[in-house]
């Protein structure tokens, strides 16, 4: 997976889940944030971020916020990147020989990111990206949501 037209910037503020203010080449730009999670541990005023310049002249914003520098690590903020990277990895043989690779597959009442056959068995794969980091440990999700909380059968 590769990003083109990347430029560094300084994160200033995030007024809502969808946009951020970033200083790029001496100008304050409103950029689209490709991750609606809170990301408070990463998007700290003054941190270095990496933005991708859009090639679409009719867009409201010229840039997408793609990644945040934290220490010596670059943390991807693009919520679509994990599935794209996993799909490329599977298609290139990362899991060995598989067939019938499909994305966004419904099975019963659930939807899975990928389905494929491995050694004649149907497999399902759910991919998660992590933006919550604490002392080198990544976690998912970065905040609780109603879809992540379910009653325990032992209660």
Predicted regions and their residues:
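Short aromatic-glycine-enriched beta-strand elements
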Residues: 16-21
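Short nucleic-acid-contacting surface segments enriched for D/E, G, S/T with interspersed K/R
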Residues: 37-50
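A short acidic/basic microdomain associated with nuclease active sites
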Residues: 89, 93-107
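Short, charged beta-turn/beta-strand-edge "cap" motif at the junction between a beta-strand
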Residues: 13, 53-58
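Short alpha-helix capping/helix-loop boundary micro-motifs
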Residues: 29-39
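Conserved catalytic cores of phosphodiester-cleaving nucleases, focusing on short active-site segments
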Residues: 9, 112-142, 155
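OB-fold/S1-family single-stranded nucleic acid-binding modules
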Residues: 56-73
